[in-house]
Amino acid sequence: MNVLQAPFVEEMVKTTKNLYRLGWDERNGGNISYLLKEEEILPFLNPTQVLRKIPMKFDATKLAGKYFIVTGSGKYFKNVCDASSENLGILRVSENGQELELLWGLEDEAVPTSELPSHFMSHIARLAVDPENRIVMHNHASHLLAMSFTHELDEKVFTRTLWQMCTECLVVFPDGVGIIPWLVPGTNEIGVATAEKMKESRLVLWPQHGIYGTGRDMDEVFGLIETAEKAAEVYTYVCAQGGVRQTISDADLWRLAEAFGVTPKVGYLEEKVSKRRKL
């Protein structure tokens, strides 16, 4: 069967096209990695046929033998649909965790995204929390990026602002938003910082840069970032209209959490409200 007909390739094509349409992945900005199961690739590829090996600059032993489809370095999301094999690659992490075995794509000696260290470290962190985690997505969601210039970069305060902008936010990301300091992209340092935040939050903000999101499937991750971005957009409108005059109270957020069976990140809502609702 043609690899281009594989459901996971089609998902990557549709998602990158949509992200480019939204303006969140200008030029070659943004990247996606998708953890694949061997049974998913077997109808389309022979895993013993390695096209070439690509060295890595960090130890990925914890992902040894695992398969991924990833976006390429310097590749434009707008081109993925028409030239998938040039802009995407299916890889396996070698048994020693020091190199990648290319099984398909990344033609003309292309290499995976320069953010692969951050992706792989985030996969490792999230798999330790949720063994079903499969997607890591990075993009430059416009309003979240803008908020990193104008809003206090305290995780609790930032998260609460988003929760209060749209009722669905607490339901979609009760674990809040992690925030790292500004760091040089494409380095192991930013990967380590991101992965540390991923232990507790599925969303991590890179100030003055973009957002990282993780989840079990493409819809979940895209929806996660999309929801936070919508809240950031509403925040932008609210500020432009003169600021907040009324919002969702902590008491109402507790009621919301109870109704949808989610647990807000500890300490992010007024504890006295939590106790009152238990009486």
Swiss-Prot record:
Keywords per UniProt: Cytoplasm, Lyase, Metal-binding, Rhamnose metabolism, Zinc
Gene Ontology biological-process annotations: pentose catabolic process; rhamnose catabolic process
Residues binding Zn(2+): H138, H140, H209
Classification via PANTHER family: 3-OXO-TETRONATE 4-PHOSPHATE DECARBOXYLASE-RELATED, FUCULOSE PHOSPHATE ALDOLASE
Record Gene3D superfamilies: Class II aldolase/adducin N-terminal domain
Family from the record: Belongs to the aldolase class II family. RhaD subfamily.
Official protein name in the record: Rhamnulose-1-phosphate aldolase
Catalytic activity: L-rhamnulose 1-phosphate = (S)-lactaldehyde + dihydroxyacetone phosphate
Keyword Cytoplasm: yes
Organism phylogeny: Bacteria, Bacillati, Bacillota, Bacilli, Lactobacillales
Species of the source: Enterococcus faecalis (strain ATCC 700802 / V583)
Cofactor(s) this protein cannot do without: Zn(2+)
Textual note on the cofactor: Binds 1 zinc ion per subunit.
Summary of the function given for this chain in its UniProt record: Catalyzes the reversible cleavage of L-rhamnulose-1-phosphate to dihydroxyacetone phosphate (DHAP) and L-lactaldehyde.
A single Gene Ontology CC term: cytosol
EC number: 4.1.2.19
